[in-house]
Amino acid sequence: MDINQMTYAVQGALQKAVAYSKEYELQNIEVEALLKAAMNENDSLFKSILERANIDVDQLIKAYDNQLSHYPTVQGDNVQYGQYISAKTNELLDKAEKYMKSYEDEFISMEHILRAAIDTDETTQKWVGNKVEVIKEIITKVRGGNHVTSQNPEVNYEALEKYGRDLVEEVRQGKMDPVIGRDEEIRNTIRILSRKTKNNPVLIGEPGVGKTAIVEGLAQRIVRKDVPESLLDKTIFELDLSALVAGAKYRGEFEERLKAVLKEVKESEGRIILFIDEIHMLVGAGKTDGAMDAGNMLKPMLARGELHCIGATTLNEYREYIEKDSALERRFQKVGVSEPDVEDTISILRGLKERYEVYHGVRIQDRALVAAAELSDRYITDRFLPDKAIDLVDQACATIRTEMGSNPTELDQVNRRVMQLEIEESALKNESDNASKHRLEELQEELSNEKEKQSSLKSRVEQEKEKIAKVQEKRAELDSSRQALEDAQTEGNLEKAAELQYGTIPQLEKELQEFEEAFQDETGEDSERMIREVVSDEEIGDIVSQWTGIPVSKLVETEREKLLSLSDILHKRVVGQDKAVDLVSDAVVRARAGIKDPNRPIGSFLFLGPTGVGKTELAKSLASSLFDSEKHMIRIDMSEYMEKHAVSRLIGAPPGYVGHDEGGQLTEAVRRNPYSVILLDEVEKAHSDVFNVLLQILDEGRLTDSKGRSVDFKNTIIIMTSNIGSQVLLENVKDAGEISDDTEKAVMDSLHAYFKPEILNRMDDIVLFKPLSVNDMSMIVDKILTQLNMRLLDQHISIEVTEEAKKWLGEEAYEPQFGARPLKRFVQRQIETPIARMMIKESLPEGTIIKVDLNDNKELDFKVVKPTS
């Protein structure tokens, strides 16, 4: 027997049989060892055929094991197990060779071994029984008229079932979600499929717009017989390219698998339509030196009309792969799939609603579907409808489902309190003093009350869970009845269809409504229930906020108070600039209330004024107030953009330049944090061409980066600071700190001389910051000293400065042209440095108070008050 005349699967089985011989200490390879090995081969054809014939393969393997354990064993140091083939095994292989010749094959394959085993092995005969003819029919069907001409023939057997899935069959089994809309694209696809030649549509559209759904919709129409007569008997197979490539170890194996698939499609004489998702992957697939890629293998069949093929790919990949191969491109007919609008998306979500309700066991409100479509369209800008809206609904349902599976917060708190009291009770029982006994009595009373409350809550939760389970059961029953109705209508079983449509389904709908109403009456409104089972627009808003960081969920009371007092919070940090603070806080309130222009940033401001008056501080304060951290501020120092070419750093380097893959500093920061404060500091230091980039941001709220991606700035606050006109402000400010009209005009003239009108015209407001007065300085002193006290808090030391000393600090450090910065330096010299020396010189105990006062010589005195022990 020549081992080279066997397929790889049979050779592998023989090698495994040697291992089994060693396991059972047998010198010969017995027939049972070979057959057991044939069963346990990867993707075993031997096992697959027996399973189809309804033979219990696990019991058969046990029977082989039992038989092997009865053979005489050989033991010793130099025994080579499985070195020889037994007479029975030899007889089986001879018989298999005869079957090979009768099938006109070139190699002994697994089906020959199976036929030989049925003829020669008693154990196999006993288990197969009277199913020999059934097995013969299965073998004929599996081979599909193919001959074994290679050592890997299994790839040619039932190739479509191995490397594809039948979409029409999945629709019949109710495994597919309904497809809503897309009628025009489906009709277009049907027209192209009905052509004589080049009847191959390719669906082109952005990721997530529903290309695959169009093919699923066509499969559903075929099942419903809602297609032209020429397509009624068709079936759609989706080709799994990854399965086609996976495990193709030898050169030419991939091509062999693809040829087997194409052969089956061709032999179906147009009955099979092949759907290839991500069709661009075929171009270059399997390409090695001197080999042909998969795309070239398809071309002849596509041109002759022997292969009905539907492709799907994205616009970018079509351009990159398919358009480059013009011979392949001309064999396909393009069908554009555009993104549906919000109204169409809402219709799609309404069609899918029931499926998601049954799957998650929740109830989805209609306003949740509307919110999912609208919020995803507005805030999730880097993905496409309807995919992103469906994802939102799915995530919200999963969130509610997770909550339903765990204890409600109220019950969880009571459980923890009961456990805490029980631990305390067991500890107090060991004490004998009166105080402990008295506490034990109080505790036992409290524990009794808590346990009663726990029992009541548990009972409520169980009742609600029971009711929800009943509602879920009815929903699932109704869904399966509707699927059965579709099947009955498709099969033409009118009696069953009538019974379902006019009897079963209305009855189930009535029962479901009664259950839901009873549940509503018993448990009250949704807000009063222990367990939430309703998905509302609030849950959708929460998910959008999680994904994007943009607060779109309903305002909670604490946030309302925070927004209404935003102006006061900012006033505490920014001294003397009331107009600027009010303008910025008003813009935030408008945005959070949802009445701002949805196509522009929340606000865009240009802050003008001398150095050190609070322009940058206001931007920091705003970021800190909105996000509880200054880190959410995107700060760009425009002094770094003095050259003309530096604009590429904002939006990313052009293709071909170093750093193209890294993206721009501004665009990447906003893509990661779409809800943020953007501070463009010292804008007059930048090159004038840099401002051209800002035009689209200020007007349309978007910017296209170097990779062609549109970045959304609609949820940002843009603040620019500049010192233009600061000299005019310093020279002409009134005593009360007010800015006169003439001064304002002079500053604006300076501004117009530097900035182009189209930039200034797009800004919401230009705010003039007035120079700080002496009164402002005393307030800033308070702020600086508060910050110092916060830093000393870790060391449990505090300072107290008298009003006289504070006034002196403010007056001495007052320099109008430099703002508040000199004051900071003055406080460092006059207060921080002496305190630091005192702390190093003598160790100050915790609780020490350092009192600072002004003496007669106009110098600061420091008095250390140590805590009394």
From Swiss-Prot:
Region named Linker: 340-549
GO cellular component labels: cytoplasm
Region feature (C-terminal): 772-869
Positions of ATP 1 binding: G205, E206, P207, G208, V209, G210, K211, T212
Annotated region (Repeat 2), positions in chain: 85-145
One term of GO molecular function: ATP hydrolysis activity
This protein's UniProt keywords: ATP-binding, Chaperone, Coiled coil, Cytoplasm, Nucleotide-binding, Repeat, Stress response
Signal peptide stretch: none
UniProt-listed InterPro entries: AAA+_ATPase, ATPase_AAA_core, Chaperonin_ClpB, Clp_ATPase_C, Clp_N_dom_sf, Clp_R_dom, ClpA/B, ClpA/B_CS1
Sites where the protein binds ATP 2: G609, P610, T611, G612, V613, G614, K615, T616
Repeat 1 as annotated region, ranges: 6-71
Family annotation (Pfam families): AAA, AAA_2, AAA_lid_9, Clp_N, ClpB_D2-small
Region described as NBD1: 158-339
Region listing for NBD2, in residue ranges: 559-771
A GO BP entry: cellular response to heat
Protein family: Belongs to the ClpA/ClpB family.
Subunit structure of this chain's protein: Homohexamer. The oligomerization is ATP-dependent.
PANTHER family according to UniProt: ATP-DEPENDENT CLP PROTEASE, HEAT SHOCK PROTEIN 104
NCBIfam families cross-referenced by the UniProt entry: chaperone_ClpB (TIGR03346)
Function: Part of a stress-induced multi-chaperone system, it is involved in the recovery of the cell from heat-induced damage, in cooperation with DnaK, DnaJ and GrpE. Acts before DnaK, in the processing of protein aggregates. Protein binding stimulates the ATPase activity; ATP hydrolysis unfolds the denatured protein aggregates, which probably helps expose new hydrophobic binding sites on the surface of ClpB-bound aggregates, contributing to the solubilization and refolding of denatured protein aggregates by DnaK.
Protein name: Chaperone protein ClpB
Protein source organism: Staphylococcus epidermidis (strain ATCC 12228 / FDA PCI 1200)
Gene name in the database record: clpB
